[in-house]
């Protein structure tokens, strides 16, 4: 279990005891959701039932990436996908390599090396070993990086919880993040949106993204997303990529539904 690996069992047990005390029910059964269950529940909560068995879900977190898919056309087996890389861990590894040169140019050089290493040693193997390429027509990506990229590539889609993107669109965004960050200013990005209410919402969304992520962390998250997407971008077969804006609530909603059913 992930908590055991991180030596957090005592912390979790204390949290459960505190919860029982607060609700005045010392014998209440409290289930701990492990990484396998969380990834499975995320799939059930995020991916529409019509696309359940041909969609590979990937959640890019701050310290790691996880996800998976149902390989046999039923809910009995869920194949887990895991990477020990996330937006923050990529950024931290890059900054460590920068040493005393904190310039954007050096950050970009070191980021390229970190991402290249992650791709060659982890990402390619994780995708290939999952067997997801042949079985998945759709690649859905959730997490903070996906939320950020969705709002920056398609600010006009304010009411869409799921945003379709192409590899080229995300690649173009990365180039802007490095070479022309001013072009991603909220008012500039939203200027082509004609309806004022939608334009104001788009500006609000972009400001929220840039409040959470600075330029360098956006480069790290977008770069990691690109490396993952690259494994599914082929001249011979087209995969559909989707970015999920509110993926964090997915596994929770599925967990609640499952609990009610049981």
Pin down the residues of each PLM region.
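Helical "lid/coupling" subdomains associated with nucleotide-phosphate turnover
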Residues: 3-13, 17-54, 69-71, 77-262
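Short glycine-aspartate micro-motif
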Residues: 55-59
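Acidic, divalent-metal-coordinating active-site segment for phosphoryl/phosphodiester hydrolysis
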Residues: 63-67
